[in-house]
């Protein structure tokens, strides 16, 4: 089973309004992402911050349009950032791994989704990699130094065994997502326009980003 977690529980302070429902090219951002996921995954867990937003997104999304099951869930704790959203989603999935995506990246394409899961499957065929915790894209640089700083943690695949670790991080007021990559069995895959288009990682955070 291929699972995906879509993080829609952010406060959107820089944008000034809920991002996932904002229209770009005549469609809500979240619809662009769901179309990229279609025929690529089996289930999608959408993490939101309250019942009102769940009702709002249920009006935007109709289950019959997609090949995968859609589940809506409320973030375990509001305003703790994407790290808490990842934990919430991992607790709901019916598989061991999930691709985590943000709701403000409308240029995610199906090739990226396919590549991530295909790479994961190839890795897991090797018994030596059964303990893999995360599959993380990163931007290349000379000598590939400081990979963690150039990684894309919100476009990555995580194992649900992260749940107790994330809970511990949050209990200690550690909220940065990049902490998931430290001292863990993570595999980094380089972002290359021939395999992974860099547009997949473009976030729309401010009104001016949409106007560009």
List where the protein language model places each region.
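SAM-dependent methyltransferases
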Residues: 1-3, 207-212
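Nucleotide and nucleotide-moiety/phosphate-recognizing core
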Residues: 1-154, 160-200
């Amino acid at each position: 089973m291929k699972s995906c977690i879509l993080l829609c529980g952010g406060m959107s302070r820089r944008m000034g309004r809920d991002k996932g429902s904002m229209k770009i090219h005549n469609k809500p951002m979240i619809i662009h992402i769901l179309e990229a996921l279609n025929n690529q995954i089996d289930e999608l867990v959408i993490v939101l911050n309250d019942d009102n937003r769940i009702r709002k997104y249920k009006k935007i999304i109709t289950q019959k349009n997609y090949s995968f099951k859609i589940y809506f869930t409320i973030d375990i704790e509001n305003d703790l950032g994407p790290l808490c959203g990842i934990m919430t989603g991992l607790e709901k999935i019916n598989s061991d791994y999930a691709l985590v995506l943000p709701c403000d990246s409308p240029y995610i394409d199906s090739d990226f989704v396919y590549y991530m899961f295909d790479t994961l499957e190839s890795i897991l065929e090797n018994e030596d990699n059964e303990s893999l915790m995360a599959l993380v894209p990163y931007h290349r640089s000379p000598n590939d130094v400081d990979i963690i700083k150039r990684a894309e943690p919100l476009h990555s695949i995580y194992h649900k065994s992260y749940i107790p670790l994330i809970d511990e991080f949050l209990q200690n007021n550690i909220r940065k997502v990049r902490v998931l990559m430290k001292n863990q069995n993570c595999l980094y895959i380089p972002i290359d326009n021939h395999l992974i288009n860099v547009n997949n990682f473009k976030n729309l955070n401010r009104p001016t980003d949409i106007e560009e």
